[in-house]
Amino acid sequence: MSRSLKAHILLVLVTLAWGVTFVVIKDALQDITPLLFNTLRMVLAALCLAAFYARHLPRISRATLRAGLLVGIFLWLGYEFQTTGLVLTTPSKSAFLTGLSVILVPVFLAIGWRRMVNRWTAAGVAAAFAGLYLLTVPADGRRLLSLEGINRGDLLTLGCAVAFAFQIIFLGRAMRAHHYQQVAVLQAVVAAVLMAATVPLAEHPHVVWSGRVLWAIVVTALFCTAAAFTIQAWAQQFTPPTHTALIFSLEPVFAWLTSYVVMGERLGMRAGLGAALILGGVLLSELKGSAAQPATEVGPALPEVSSDEV
């Protein structure tokens, strides 16, 4: 088996794991509060990454520390919004809304860094925001733009997409100037510390040590964070960026399929159309928009905690 084929297969498996864990976490949240869950998973992930990349840590510079701190803050915010929102929304909607982070990156780059947006990216953004409206805003025959009745979990997940978009931007910049092993460990450690500090302030922590809680913690910490970092760092050396974007866009699809099979979730015609528009917008922006412009100072956003990524 060639390295390229092996890399493609590994990236598909990572994306599948990310998609499946939306349902795994949703199930576990019946027995554990969301912020406590985040803390446990991220502490375990940080310990695993620190052990795996131990030989790279003694040479961390102050500049790398600052970069890891910034990326870790947005990683923390993204996870907190995502997991808290998942308590109140469905796995499929959470996955598609989290995927908006990819679309928000060029928007924020245009606003904050004066980056030009080409027509393909603009079309992708427009399609994704149209899908966002259909997916989150309940139908109201009296008022076309009525925002009443929006699920609070959907709003929290939108906050997650915003945070992950900034995490992608700052991670990409950090990856051009610092060793990815050091940044990977630092962002996980920073997120873990902030999560632990937030728990007593923002919720009344509670856990029933059931099998589904333990399974969710192990899967998300070891496979979807620690192992995923390592796999991405290796696999994307042998995978064209357009192939990577296409593979990662399957995450919400895997989440929806898992939720449909395991939980019987059905999006309905309106929400399904919204999800399709979001997915189409992401693909248009990533496959056509990225191909139409050269690489920028933002750099490769890898290894990262994905769209998503739960």
Regions found by a protein language model. Give the residues of each.
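Hydrophobic alpha-helical transmembrane segments of multi-pass integral membrane proteins
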Residues: 6-10, 36-51, 121-134, 151-159, ...
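Glycine-/small-residue-enriched transmembrane alpha-helix faces in small-molecule transporters
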Residues: 1-36, 73, 81, 143-173, ...
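Specific transmembrane alpha-helical segments of multi-pass solute transporters/efflux pumps
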Residues: 17, 21-22, 50-98, 134, ...
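Helix-helix packing/entry segments at the starts of transmembrane helices
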Residues: 38-40, 94-101, 170-193, 221-261
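C-terminal transmembrane-helix exit sites in multi-pass transporters
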Residues: 48-58, 101-126, 253-273
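Membrane-interface helix termini and inter-helical loops of multi-pass transporters
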Residues: 23-31, 84-87, 136-150, 199-217, ...
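Hydrophobic/small/kink-forming positions within alpha-helical transmembrane segments
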Residues: 16-19, 23, 50, 72, ...
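Hydrophobic transmembrane alpha-helices of multi-pass small-molecule transport proteins
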Residues: 49, 69, 117-139, 161, ...
